UniProtKB/Swiss-Prot annotation:
Species of the source: Geobacter metallireducens (strain ATCC 53774 / DSM 7210 / GS-15)
Protein name, as recorded: Translational regulator CsrA
Role played: A translational regulator that binds mRNA to regulate translation initiation and/or mRNA stability. Usually binds in the 5'-UTR at or near the Shine-Dalgarno sequence preventing ribosome-binding, thus repressing translation. Its main target seems to be the major flagellin gene, while its function is anatagonized by FliW.
Protein family: Belongs to the CsrA/RsmA family.
GO cellular-component term (any): cytosol
Main location: cytoplasm
One biological process term in Gene Ontology: regulation of carbohydrate metabolic process
GO molecular function, one term: mRNA 5'-UTR binding
Length: 78
């Protein structure tokens, strides 16, 4: 892992298309501004991990589980 020290207003450049700028510092929090291509997904780590976990749970459903859920949901429609 590369560890860098930056001051307010200073920027880190990653490759040709990504720039990370220190926008604000309050106590123990740092606000970062990120410039990147629109098709690049950028997540806070806690959100990224949650999405990964939910995707894994959804992928673990079997065809039988899905059929049961569909049958259950449609049971009261008649």
């Amino acid at each position: 892992m590369l560890v860098l020290t930056r001051k307010m207003g200073e920027t880190i450049t990653i490759g040709d298309q990504i720039r990370i700028k220190v926008v604000e510092m309050k106590g123990n929090q740092v606000r970062l501004g990120i410039e990147a291509p629109g098709d690049m997904r950028i997540y806070r780590e806690e959100i990224y991990l949650k999405v990964q976990k939910e995707n894994q749970l959804a992928a673990a459903w079997s065809l039988e589980d899905l059929e049961s859920a569909v049958n259950f949901a449609g049971a009261g429609k008649e």
